[in-house]
Structure formats: structure tokens, C-alpha cells
Amino acid sequence: MDQTELNELRTLRHSASHILAQAVKRLYPDARLAIGPAIDTGFYYDFDTETTFTTEDLESIEAEMKKIVKENLRIERFTLPRDEAKKLMADEPYKLELIDGLEEGAEISFYKQGEFTDLCAGPHVAYTKKVKAFKLLSVTGAYWRGDSDNKMLQRIYGTAFASKEELDEYLNMLEEAKKRDHRKLGKELGLFMMTDDGPGFPFFLPNGMVLKNTLIDYWREVHKRYGYVEISTPVILNRRLW
């Protein structure tokens, strides 16, 4: 994929994020919008809402997105002076914060599709119907601006491609990756266990110790073959060392 194709895919995914936001606003009018960029694997949008999104909610939101695509809404760009921009976004506190963060004299642009308008630098596709192959994948928490002192928002992740074939190929890859997830395999093979007493720290079980020691033995063999020697250092040291 060349740079032109990558840019086109990124634009498509960015537009998919706006369609996601429009669908959420239709189904949950009280939801407040944060940001919704394209990313390397697809797109996401952050929402501030009292509703805790579930897997079933994602299915409903995706169905609404498909309706918006079928409506073939024109996506139009326009700009406004700062005062008018803030009036337009008066009910969107996160958008107001973004506007306030723009430099004086900066262009403030919006994109409109049907009843939905979002603060955005773009670019976007011309019509919603161009976003044909997409899928919502998951929902997770995300702090506003990535700062734990700010409110926790809900981030919906999705992906989009130029064709259904590409989308299906990607979704199949994700399914295969899940089958090979070390957390899944570790439990199924009895390699290790996790406990709330040490979140993120595995407790190796007998099968896991056999595998771990086999890997360590191989590691030692390779290092010895190439002339390396082994040392051992303390686990805890004074912080001034760093």
C-alpha cells in the first residue's frame, strides 16, 4: 500500500469515526463528544455518558451506523469565527475546551453530515455511503486527554476498510490472534495463574515452570556458545542509581 492509499484509508476511517459519533448521538442524545481520530488499526471515539456501553449496545450502534451510511449524507466542511464556533458547540464541553486550546487566529473548521456537526480539521470522504466496510470491535475506558486527573470516558474502537474482503481478512486475523493469546493459552495449558493479590504478575504452575526452565536452559546454552558470562544483581537498589 503506497502513501496515497494509506492517506485514503486514513480518511475513510476518520469519516467512520464521525459516523460512529453521529450514531451514538442519535441513540444517546445526552452523550458528550470528546475526540475521534483515525489510528493505524482503525478508529475510535471517546464519549462522556452515564450509559455504560455493552456488547449489545455496540451492535445497536453499528446498526445505526449502517443506516447513516445508507442515507448517503453529504459531508460538508465549513469554518466559523471563534465566538460563533463556541456558540455552536455550547452543549459540548470537551469541544469547547479544544476550541479554547487553539491559537489565536487559527482556522476553526467543522464537518456536517445531516443533523450531525463535529469540530474537526478533516479530511473526510464526500458522502457517508463511501464508508461501506466497517466493524465496531470493543469499548474501554480512557481518561480525557490521557490524564488520570481528568474524567474517565468511554472509548469505542472500530475498524474500516475500502472493501468487505479486506475487512473480513482483518477480522479473521484478529480471531486467529485471540486463539494464540498467551492469557488464554496460559490458562488452558495450566502454565500460570493470576490473582487479584498481584494484578499483572503471573504465578507459574508446574507446567509453566517446566516451560520456563526449558527456555532459560536454552538461553544459557546460546549465551555460553557465544562467549557470554552470567552475573546476578540485586532486585532492589537505592533510587539514586537511576
State what each model feature region is:
Residues 26:
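Metal-associated gating/positioning segment near the N- to mid-region
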